Structures are given as C-alpha cells and as structure tokens.
C-alpha cells in the first residue's frame, strides 16, 4: 500500500516518434471499487499522435479533466486536433469529452458501433462520428495511419483496440494494465508488478475470459509483432510483452479449468448494477469459481440459453426502470424459468432509485419456480458504497461455498469401503479441536519409521468441512524444512492421561532411539502412526502463511481413523502454544 501523498499531476513523455503519453496520476486510491483494492494509486493514460491530422486517444475521467486539458494544450492547439479516439465510452470519460468538444467542436469522434450509440444518446445526433472497422484504416496524413481491432466484452461491449503499425504500438485499453502509480514510464521492474497485474486481471477480466482469449488471438496475428503495449492504466509494457501476453493466456485457461461455473446475468442503466456485478464476479473468482459474465443488453439469446444449461448456478442482476426490470433482463429471466433446472443455485441483486420492484419481482419468480437462493438478495439504492461492494463479495463467497457443497452432494455415492473410510475420517476429525497432537513426517531420504521427524503441537483447529481441512501452527525452522506445500504428514491426536503426552512434552522433537520404543505403523505417506494415539489424520499441506516465528499450515485431510473408541482428547492447559 502506498504511503506517498503527492498531489495529482499529468506526466508527459514521448514513447515513439510523434507519439506522446499523458499519464494522469493519483497516488491515492482513485475509487472504492474492488479493482482499486490494492491501494497503489493509478494512472489514466491518454495518447497524442502528432501527425498532419492529429489524433488523441482516451482522455481521462472527470476527476482529471482540468489538469489534463491544461497539460494537453501545452502540446497541441486544440483547434488543430482532428480525431478523438475512444476505446470505450462511460459516463466518467464523457465529462471530459464534452469539455473537449466545447473547446474544439471540429473534432471527429472515432469509436465502435456500440460506442456511437452511447455517444449519440449522451451528447446528441449532431456529432461528427467515424465508426472504426477492422478492414478500414484511419488515415492521419503522410504515411501515418491507424488500424483497429474490435474488443467487445460483457463489461465493455463497445471495446476497441487501436494499432499504430508504423511504431508497432498496440493501444490496448483495459488489457495489460495495472492500477499502480509511480514515476517509471515503462515496466523495467516488471517482476514487482506480478501481483498487481494478476489482481487487475482477476477484477477486470476473469469473468470474461472467453472474449479476452478471442482478442488475444487477434493480437497474436499482428505482423510485425507489437513493440509496445500502451494500456489505459499503469506502466507501458515494453520489457515483459511476451511474458504478460502468456500470463493472460494462462490466467484465462486457469478460469476455464475450474470445476464449477456460474453464469452472471445483468443489465445496467446507469452503471450501478454493473459495479455490483463486477464485485460479485471478483468474489466468485477469488473463491475458485469460474464466472461467465453476461451483459443482457449485448448477448445474443442463443448464447444466454447455452449458458443456462452449461452453468452450475446463476446470478441475475437488474436495475429498476419505471417500476419494472429492463426488457433484456426479462428475456434472460424467461429463459431461466423456461429452460433452467430448479436444482441449480440462484442469486439476485440489483440497484434502484426509489422502490426496487424489479429486484423483488425476480426474486419472487425464482422462488415460485422452486429455485434455492445462495445468498440473501442484495438491494442497493443509487450508487453503491464501499460497504455495499464488501457485501457483494461476502455474498459471492457464500454462493460459491454453497454451490461447491451442492455439487459435492450430487456426485456418485462411494462404495461401501470408501463410505467406511469417510466415516472413520469424520470420526477422527471430530477429535481435532483444541487437542494435543504429535505431527509426524518422514523426511526425504529416510525410509524407516524410526527415522521420522515428530513434534508436539497444540494450536490445531478444523478449518474447512468440504473438503475436511485443518490448520496447524508450527515453529518456523520446523515448517520451513518439513512442511512445504505438497508435503504429507500424520497428525496423531493424543488421549487425555496417555503417557505419550508427558513423553512428548519433555522433548519437542524425538530422536530415532525414542521413536523406536513406541508402537508404530506406516501411513500411506510413509509417516508413522502412533498406535497408542486416540486417533490419527493423514494430511497434505495445501497452503502456508508466515506469522513471524511460526508458520500457519493449512492441510487437507485425506484419510484418518479413530484408534480408540473411548477416552477424551488431551488438551493443552498452559496458555502459550507449542
């Protein structure tokens, strides 16, 4: 998190002959929306192409309008500006566009066909418009021209990517960016950007990976290949082009490989419902669920129908317009009610100005049809607040966990032998809370049970139910060498009054000679099970958290057994944990 509090400014630099970047910078969190959650500040990047017929790309939003236009006029007479290219249109950017048009009414606006509809609705029919097409370059005079790639996604249905073939620059808008503010123009320290880039992708693109992959395919066909990616936010991508491009491929593939998929249907009149949808999508993604965002205003009906059948659950969001849901949402809801399975989990959310009838109507129709809701319906009046977005993420996590549990319950029942093992494991897990345990593991290169490492632990808790999981606190030096992610161990749960308790309390780690005096048998992993323990669990380390002089280990329980049917679990009575 940034602690720097410099005032907002506009950084200007030349990134290629005749191409300037104007980076409107803020070191504070620009908005409360989830995508800015890492609180690293951000830049809003605009680009000026100095040609016989100059073109300006993507002016920033309203909070930068004044300082941006002041800086822009130091580099061009606005009366000479010929084209204003908009990679996407939103209400925030429109505020700056309107001021520009007042100062330079001769400007021709360049956008996608969908963007033109928005512009005419917001500004009027009198606009000078040029609709970008993939097969038609925009001539800037001399040997300068720009090409275009359609980049429509559910979140930005009017998306447009601009290509400068002469300088080999791709003006990638929302692709390849990061919400990071700094003095570095380029990504020289690109390794330090990994987490910010991944978070940016998760928030903006994880729910629309199908469309992102299609755009990546078109970018891969560019000849010659790009020298720079010039995104809307963060550093210009120069030193990690191939790496970041492959990261986007990998992140898209990772979403497609998730076992559970949710279709997120929504329409948004003023952007508020879309903000809620984005927060829900991010929460689902963080919970390990594949999300397919469906903007009902732009998605073909056949595509909606296919998603209803292929998804494990669905969530539908709507504004309220004149006391009703928009026609596009009615269409999606109609498909769900007519073709959806009532065994699938559902969810409802929306924004409204006065009464919110559309949200109530959707909820009631789904309940009447026999659907189960995965979270309490979310109703937000006017513009969502930070608290509202937090509620969206909590609801999304609830939905994801309920969906996974529902999916698990519908799998084929195991054989009687497997059922018996599940029952034994459950009985053993029930003994874990607050107990004294001995953790044993067989180090690499060791083959005999008496060579195992063992340690007494008391900070043990059940952390998850499906799959069963536990957390264990271990000393740093022990965890760093013997409990890495993927390692397996046995947690031997001790019985109250057992001599094992005293024996292990006297020595935090047993040597080979001491283990040799105990009754042992081998678990599947090779680690020893103490035959005099009350129960045991065989576990695999799934994740770790550094907590200073200790590590907190989360492990999934693979098997276990109650070794003694009577007796109480040994409890640590002193206040400090081992």
Curated annotation (Swiss-Prot):
Which function does this protein serve?
A: Mediates electron transfer from NADH to oxygen, reducing it to water. This modular protein has 3 redox cofactors, in other organisms the same activity requires 2 or 3 proteins.
* Region described as Zinc metallo-hydrolase: 39-233
Q: Please state the Enzyme Commission number of this protein.
A: 1.-.-.-
Q: Which PANTHER family match?
A: DIFLAVIN FLAVOPROTEIN A 2-RELATED, DIFLAVIN FLAVOPROTEIN A 4-RELATED
MF annotations from Gene Ontology: electron transfer activity; FMN binding; oxidoreductase activity, acting on the CH-NH group of donors, NAD or NADP as acceptor
What protein family is recorded? In the N-terminal section; belongs to the zinc metallo-hydrolase group 3 family.
Q: Map out region (Flavodoxin-reductase-like) in residue numbers.
A: 429-578
Quote the Pfam families the UniProt record gives: Flavin_Reduct, Flavodoxin_1, ODP
Q: Which UniProt keywords apply?
A: Electron transport, Oxidoreductase, Transport
Question: Further notes on this entry?
Answer: By homology with NorV in E.coli, may be involved in nitric oxide detoxification.
Q: What class of enzyme is it?
A: oxidoreductase
The record's cofactor note says:
Binds 2 iron ions per subunit.
Give the organism, scientific name: Thermosynechococcus vestitus (strain NIES-2133 / IAM M-273 / BP-1)
Keyword Ribonucleoprotein attributed: no
Q: Which residues form the Flavodoxin-like domain?
A: 262-404
Q: What is this protein called?
A: Putative diflavin flavoprotein A 2
List cofactor names only. Fe cation
Matching InterPro entries: Flavin_Rdtase-like_dom, Flavodoxin/NO_synth, Flavodoxin_CS, Flavoprotein-like_sf, Metallo-B-lactamas, NADH_oxidoreductase_modular, ODP_dom, RibonucZ/Hydroxyglut_hydro
SUPFAM superfamilies of this UniProt entry? Flavoproteins, FMN-binding split barrel, Metallo-hydrolase/oxidoreductase
């Amino acid at each position: 998190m940034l602690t720097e509090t410099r005032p907002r400014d506009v950084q200007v630099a030349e990134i290629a002959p005749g191409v300037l970047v104007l980076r409107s910078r803020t070191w504070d969190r620009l908005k409360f929306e989830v995508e800015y959650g890492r609180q690293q500040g951000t830049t809003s990047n605009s680009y000026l192409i100095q040609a016989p017929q100059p073109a300006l790309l993507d002016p920033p939003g309203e909070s930068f309008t004044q300082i941006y236009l002041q800086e822009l006029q130091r580099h061009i007479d606005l009366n000479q500006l010929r084209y204003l290219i908009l990679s996407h249109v939103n209400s925030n950017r429109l505020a700056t566009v309107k001021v520009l048009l007042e100062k330079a009414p001769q400007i021709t606006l360049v956008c996608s066909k969908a963007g033109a509809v928005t512009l005419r609705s917001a500004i009027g029919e009198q606009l000078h418009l040029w609709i970008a097409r993939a097969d038609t370059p925009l001539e800037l005079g001399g040997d300068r021209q720009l090409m275009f790639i359609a980049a429509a996604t559910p979140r930005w249905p009017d998306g447009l990517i601009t290509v400068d073939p002469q300088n080999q620059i791709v003006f990638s808008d929302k692709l390849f960016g990061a919400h990071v503010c700094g003095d570095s123009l380029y990504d020289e320290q690109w390794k330090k950007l990994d987490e910010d880039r991944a978070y940016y992708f998760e928030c903006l693109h994880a729910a629309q990976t199908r469309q992102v992959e299609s755009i990546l395919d078109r970018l891969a066909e560019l000849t010659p290949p790009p020298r720079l990616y010039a995104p809307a936010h963060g550093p210009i991508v120069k030193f990690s082009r191939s790496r970041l491009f492959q990261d986007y491929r990998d992140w898209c593939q990772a979403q497609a490989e998730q076992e559970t998929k949710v279709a997120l249907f929504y329409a948004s009149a003023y952007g508020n419902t879309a903000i809620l949808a984005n927060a829900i999508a991010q929460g689902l993604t963080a919970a390990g669920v594949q999300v397919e965002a469906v903007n009902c205003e732009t998605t073909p009906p056949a595509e909606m129908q296919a998603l209803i059948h292929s998804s494990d659950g669905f969530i539908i969001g709507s504004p309220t317009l004149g006391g009703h849901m928009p026609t596009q949402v009615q269409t999606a809801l109609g498909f769900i009610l007519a073709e959806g399975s009532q065994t699938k989990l559902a969810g409802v959310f929306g924004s409204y100005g006065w009464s919110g009838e559309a949200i109530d109507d959707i909820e009631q129709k789904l309940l009447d049809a026999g659907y189960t809701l995965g979270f309490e319906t979310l109703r937000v009046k006017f513009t969502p607040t930070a608290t509202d977005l937090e509620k969206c993420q909590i609801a999304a996590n609830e939905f994801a966990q309920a969906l996974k549990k529902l999916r698990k319950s519908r799998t084929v029942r195991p054989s009687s032998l497997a059922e018996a093992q599940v029952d034994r494991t459950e009985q053993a897990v029930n003994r874990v809370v607050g107990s004294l345990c001995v953790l044993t593991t067989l180090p690499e290169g060791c083959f005999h049970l008496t060579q195992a490492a063992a340690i007494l632990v008391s900070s043990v808790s059940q952390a998850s139910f499906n799959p069963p999981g536990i957390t264990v606190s271990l000393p740093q030096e022990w965890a760093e060498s013997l409990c890495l992610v993927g390692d397996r161990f046995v947690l031997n749960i001790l019985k109250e009054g057992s001599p094992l308790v005293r024996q292990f309390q006297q020595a935090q780690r047993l040597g080979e000679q001491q283990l040799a005096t105990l009754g042992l048998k081998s678990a599947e992993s090779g680690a020893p099970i103490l035959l005099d323990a009350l129960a045991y669990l065989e576990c695999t380390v799934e994740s770790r958290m550094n907590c200073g002089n200790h590590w907190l280990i989360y492990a999934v329980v693979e098997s276990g057994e109650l070794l003694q049917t009577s007796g109480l679990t040994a409890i640590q009575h002193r206040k400090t944990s081992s």
